[in-house]
């Protein structure tokens, strides 16, 4: 028997200390990693519920275990809500993460040795889109597309490569690309060469849900995403698809890749999807994009170069070469000033992947805590202050004090 009032702080002080320390970090640091966000208390409550106890292999109404009548309700709510948000014919909410969602698509439609086409990791793509060390690069023949001289996707080159190599799967989507993607152009190319067209909107899903970024669902055979990042849910994945692909995708997830779904996480996804259907969520995403534009413009005014020249989303890459500092060093010194970013390669980066010449900055988390125009401008100036004098301890101390003053005014969890 368990007593409900016995908590982690009583049973495991070491873990409780780590949780409390991380809570303090999140409250007192400005989070600028584009793939991170803050889940709502409602999402976290669902994820910490008794649904974690239930095994439910299969799908609603077709389980391999008894006693699934209540988790069926939770999963069906998640499915119905995410279909409504994105206008999808069908949806699978069971993927444990975005990588699993992408793997399931490949399992459903490809055999080892088939050719796939995705955006080059070195120019903004994601490792699951064909990186040699990833399963996608090990099992399939990979053809990559990249950027043109203006650091925008080179659609003409992509089209030429598609006709030359005739891939079975074409992937659109990126992890470090700030501009809007022309999904309709990709779809036409995929149709012309007879390829399945998959879009990975892991980074852009929240923006798409709110209508501030193009929706690929009308154009794609399959759309994958994570449920955290800009969508602001629990860590997990989803797959949206045309109805004719539902059976193949569902079979690829279970029993193809996964066993029992995480019902507590699926319930948390459902809660996040309901939140994403609210007017407040749309206003939030509008501010995410506005904050990103303000940060990019301010950094440009301070002498930093934004890759692609601008952002049209929530994310940007900053080229640091003119400042004589690497991405690795910038990540460290900004972290010392309590601003969390990640080092990131820029196109044609001369540095090693763990060093890099750039950093990636995103605005979803800072916007969740209430930052608007003024705070976005202040944050960008604080970033620039650090990067102008990265080895000056007094400068770092002064910026850290300003960061604390700002975060104290905008707590994440009140």
Curated annotation (Swiss-Prot):
One of its GO terms (biological process) is tetrahydrofolate interconversion. This is Serine hydroxymethyltransferase. The lineage of its organism: Bacteria, Pseudomonadati, Pseudomonadota, Betaproteobacteria, Burkholderiales. The gene is glyA. InterPro entries: PyrdxlP-dep_Trfase, PyrdxlP-dep_Trfase_major, PyrdxlP-dep_Trfase_small, Ser_HO-MeTrfase, Ser_HO-MeTrfase-like, Ser_HO-MeTrfase_PLP_BS, SHMT-like_dom. Catalyzes the reversible interconversion of serine and glycine with tetrahydrofolate (THF) serving as the one-carbon carrier. This reaction serves as the major source of one-carbon groups required for the biosynthesis of purines, thymidylate, methionine, and other important biomolecules. Also exhibits THF-independent aldolase activity toward beta-hydroxyamino acids, producing glycine and aldehydes, via a retro-aldol mechanism. Belongs to the SHMT family. Its main location: cytoplasm. One of its GO terms (cellular component) is cytosol. Pathway: One-carbon metabolism; tetrahydrofolate interconversion; Amino-acid biosynthesis; glycine biosynthesis; glycine from L-serine: step 1/1. Its EC number is 2.1.2.1.
């Amino acid at each position: 028997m368990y007593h409900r009032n016995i908590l982690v702080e009583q049973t495991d002080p070491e873990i409780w200390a780590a949780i409390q320390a991380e809570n303090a970090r999140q409250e007192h640091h400005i989070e600028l990693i584009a793939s991170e966000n803050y889940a709502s208390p409602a999402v976290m409550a669902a994820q910490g519920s008794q649904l974690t106890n239930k095994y439910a292999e299969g799908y609603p109404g077709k389980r391999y275990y008894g006693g699934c009548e209540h988790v069926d309700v939770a999963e069906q709510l998640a499915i119905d809500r995410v279909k409504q948000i994105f206008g999808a014919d069908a949806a699978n909410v069971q993927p444990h993460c975005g990588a699993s969602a992408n793997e399931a698509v490949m399992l459903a439609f490809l055999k080892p040795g088939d050719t796939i086409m995705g955006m080059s990791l070195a120019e903004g793509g994601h490792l699951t889109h064909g990186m040699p060390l990833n399963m996608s690069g090990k099992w399939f023949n990979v053809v990559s597309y990249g950027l043109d001289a203006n650091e925008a996707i080179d659609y003409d080159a992509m089209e030429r490569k598609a006709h030359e190599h005739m891939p079975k799967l074409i992937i659109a989507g990126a992890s470090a690309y700030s501009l809007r993607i022309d999904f309709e152009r990709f779809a036409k190319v995929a149709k012309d060469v007879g390829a399945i067209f998959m879009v990975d909107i892991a980074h852009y899903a929240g923006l798409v849900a709110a209508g501030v970024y193009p929706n690929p669902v009308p154009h794609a055979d399959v759309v994958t995403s994570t449920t955290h990042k800009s969508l602001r849910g629990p860590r997990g994945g989803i797959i949206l698809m045309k109805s004719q692909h539902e059976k193949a995708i569902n079979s690829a997830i279970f029993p193809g890749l996964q066993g029992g779904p995480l019902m507590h996480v699926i319930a948390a996804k459902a809660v996040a999807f309901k939140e994403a259907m609210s007017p407040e969520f749309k206003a939030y995403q509008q501010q995410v994009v506005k904050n990103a534009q303000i940060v990019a413009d301010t950094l440009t005014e301070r002498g930093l170069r934004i890759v692609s020249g601008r952002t049209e989303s929530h994310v940007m890459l900053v080229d640091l070469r003119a400042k004589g500092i690497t991405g690795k060093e910038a990540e460290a010194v900004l972290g010392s000033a309590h601003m969390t970013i990640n080092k990131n390669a820029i196109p044609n980066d001369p540095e090693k992947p763990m060093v890099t010449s750039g950093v990636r900055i995103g605005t979803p988390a800072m916007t969740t805590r209430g930052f608007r125009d003024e705070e976005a401008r202040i944050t960008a100036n604080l970033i620039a202050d650090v990067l102008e004098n990265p080895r000056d301890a007094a400068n770092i101390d002064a910026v850290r004090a300003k960061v604390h003053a700002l975060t104290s005014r905008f707590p994440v969890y009140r």
